[in-house]
Amino acid sequence: MTKIRVHEYAKQVNKTSKEVIEALSKLNVSVTNHMSMLEKDIVSKLNQTFKATPEKNVGKQATQNISQKSQSNGQQNHSVKKQEGQRQQSATSKPKVNNQQHSNSSNEKSKNTKGNQNRNMTQNNNNNNNNNNNNRRGGGGYNQRPKPGIHGGKRRHPKTHQPSIPVKQKELPEKITFVESLSVAELAKKLHREPSEIIKKLFMLGVMATINQELDKDAIELICADYGVEVEEEIRVDITDLETHFEQTEEVNEAQLSERPPVVTIMGHVDHGKTTLLDSIRNTKVTAGEAGGITQHIGAYQVTEGDKKITFLDTPGHAAFTTMRARGAKVTDLTILVVAADDGVMPQTVEAINHAKAAEVPIIVAVNKMDKPSANPDRVMQELTEHGLVPEAWGGETIFVPISALKGEGIDTLLEMILLVAEVGELKANPDRLALGTVIEAQLDKGRGSVATLLVQDGTLKVGDPIVVGHTFGRVRAMVNDKGRRVKEAGPSTPVEITGLNDVPQAGDRFVVFEDEKTARQVGETRAMSAIQAQRSEKQRVTLDNLFEQMSQGEMKELNLIVKADVQGTVEAMAASLMKIDVEGVNVKIIHTGAGAITESDISLAAASNAIVIGFNVRPDVNAKRAAEEEGVDIRLHRIIYKVIEEIEQAMKGMLDPEFEEKIIGQAEVRQTIKVSKVGTIAGSYVTEGKVTRDSGVRVIRDNVVIFEGELDTLKRFKDEVKEVARGYECGITITNFNDIKEGDIIEAYIMEEVKRV
């Protein structure tokens, strides 16, 4: 005997469980309840206490039970034999059916004269003989119908009852893990116990459960605590969501992190010297190889200053590349705003400032073209102060560096300032982990297939790594750095061009490296399938229609607005009025203002910042309309200022009036007019299209010009009022407050349908 429960031991020594527990407490042995297990040495101490030997008593009791059962079985067998003999004797007195039956009955009589020892053997031989006879006859015979009470002529063997041997249970595990929940059966399997035992423990805890019932975390912990088993809940991470991999970088141990180069974006107005500045930094002629001297794509380059590196993204400054500039601002640590000293702040300079502020990226102002006689840096500083960029010399926090990109003056100072800001920002990454980052640009090359320029933001990217990029996947076949040389690996903040993807990703997509190609393939295929099903489902753009819904769900903390008007004075008045809107939970933030038409640049900025565009006395141009439809940007056009304020305030409070859309349901041609006193002019009409209904609105059209719009007064057919008249039928129509109807007029019927807000 190894272990025994308290209540089992109490039963063996004819004691109550309470008495045994009291005896154990006197022996300084702590037990929780009657289900507790007792070790062998504890049982020995209890035996001495109670002066009993439980194991021997159990053995004697088992022997007595077996002897009693065998005696009762013997008596039962004797009575069965006696009854069978009587039945067989009565069976012989029945008339003979055929020789086969006669032989069977005679065999049975002879069997009765033999001892009980050979009864079973004889019975089996008889059955075999019967089967052999049937086989000799070609299977044409039939089995003899069993005698009543004989049960087919087969005798059941008396069962010998043996004492059950207890099955040794497996040892309890030290620790179990689960995800969210476990059923009773699953928990029992993990604990190496029977489900009935778990159900019993749950019942003792006041929980009624079935074998397939799911148990929550608290119930699992209580059961495991009773067994002394440690519990750990596993949290499953959706590896197909690439953003979760970026969130995990925040949980890395500080000891694993090392300093990384800063990623810098150069922004500014057209021809203010962005590419020339980068050209001076790299000492290469990038501008000479570009069409028209304007950068045609996002280029990523890395330069060395002393013993440290700096990564530059040359974001195009032309208005047609506003979207690319918005993407570039999202992956950078620092923005260099290039402003020409002889030109000052221009519209695209303001847009660049707004992009950087929206991305919460620090700005260093590089005042370029200082070598020109007309250079006026004080004017530049004054204009930038109006946009929130106050120089350090004037008590602000913005660093201003005067440079001449063409002559290379001030470049060293600019690089020192970049490294200084980067040092303050404590830019770090873990180079020992699997790489992740962002796509800067991608294209399909005829010779190399899918080519993507990647910026590694964390970890180290190596040749041969299985990679998932956006909704595509592959294996890094080759890597080329910004100097055109092949490399085998790229660390944090390093731009590289890779090949080996099965499709062309989109610029701005995230990329993550996985441990094996199988996982990368599964994740890539899953993401591609979900993208197809959702039809490139993106984050829902905020509109005035869904603003309150997003506020209710806690998705909106700030309402970004872009305000455009016909004159600058109106812009300032609208901006001031909009900033005064006070609704609990959401702040109004105006990220860009300007005088003039709504352009494609405004739509691009709104898409990048999830903003609403408000136009006052201005309209979007063709390109802006198309871009707004593609990006899902909400444009609101108004001519009265207070209506703008009222609409936005009501949207924030969820009180927007429903939208209605006009739907033309039919037309009728006036073929005869009848003037009736006290009624007016009745138009005898013929419905040519659709139908005319009693509750529809109507407009009278004469020579393709609308001369009146109102409501129907009466609609009749043969003096009877009707609800509607369909196409091909004649009717009489009178219009409220309008009698100037002439033959040949067209009466157009329409209804106003409420449009469901999306």
From Swiss-Prot:
What Gene3D superfamilies does the record point to?
1.10.10.2480, P-loop containing nucleotide triphosphate hydrolases, Translation factors, Translation initiation factor IF- 2, domain 3
Annotated region described as Disordered, given as residue ranges = 55-168
Where, subcellularly, is it found?
Answer: Cytoplasm
Where do the segments described as G1 lie? 268-275
Task: List all Low complexity biased stretches.
Answer: 96-136
What InterPro entries does its record include? EF-G-like_DII, IF2_II, IF2_N, P-loop_NTPase, Small_GTP-bd, T_Tr_GTP-bd_dom, TF_IF2_bacterial-like, TIF_IF2
* Role this protein plays: One of the essential components for the initiation of protein synthesis. Protects formylmethionyl-tRNA from spontaneous hydrolysis and promotes its binding to the 30S ribosomal subunits. Also involved in the hydrolysis of GTP during the formation of the 70S ribosomal complex.
Name of the molecule in the record? Translation initiation factor IF-2
Per the UniProt record, the lineage of the source organism begins with: Bacteria, Bacillati, Bacillota, Bacilli, Bacillales
Q: Gene symbol?
A: infB
